[in-house]
Amino acid sequence: MSQERLLSVLRAPHISEKATNNAEKSNTVVLKVALDANKAEIAAAVAQLFEVKVDSVRTVVVKGKTKRRGNKMGRRSDWKKAYVTLAEGQNLDFVDSAE
C-alpha cells in the first residue's frame, strides 16, 4: 500500500462512551475511516502507523441524519466506523498521547 493511501485511510479516533468501554474491556479501538477503505487496508494502516499488531477489524457504515434548518432540509454525510481489536499486550491510547 502506498504511503499516500495509508495516510488517507484513517481519519480520526471516534471518542464515545461505548468506544471507551470497548477499549477498557476488549482492547478495541474505534476509528473513523475513509468510506471506500476495506478491512485489509484499515488493518495495514493501523499496524504500520501505530506499530501495533492488529487482531481483527469490524466495520460499519453510519448513515447521515436528515437535518432541518428553518425551511431548508439537508442531510449529513455517511461515514465509516472501524472497530480495530489489538493483539494481547498491545496498547493504543489516544487520550494519554494528547497530553
Swiss-Prot record:
UniProt-listed Gene3D superfamilies: 3.30.70.330
Residue ranges of coiled coil: none
GO cellular component terms given for this protein: ribonucleoprotein complex; ribosome
PANTHER family registered for this protein in UniProt: 60S RIBOSOMAL PROTEIN L23A
Family, per entry: Belongs to the universal ribosomal protein uL23 family.
Quaternary structure annotation from Swiss-Prot or TrEMBL: Part of the 50S ribosomal subunit. Contacts protein L29, and trigger factor when it is bound to the ribosome.
Protein name (record): Large ribosomal subunit protein uL23
Record organism: Haemophilus influenzae (strain PittGG)
Taxonomic lineage: Bacteria, Pseudomonadati, Pseudomonadota, Gammaproteobacteria, Pasteurellales
Gene expressing this chain: rplW
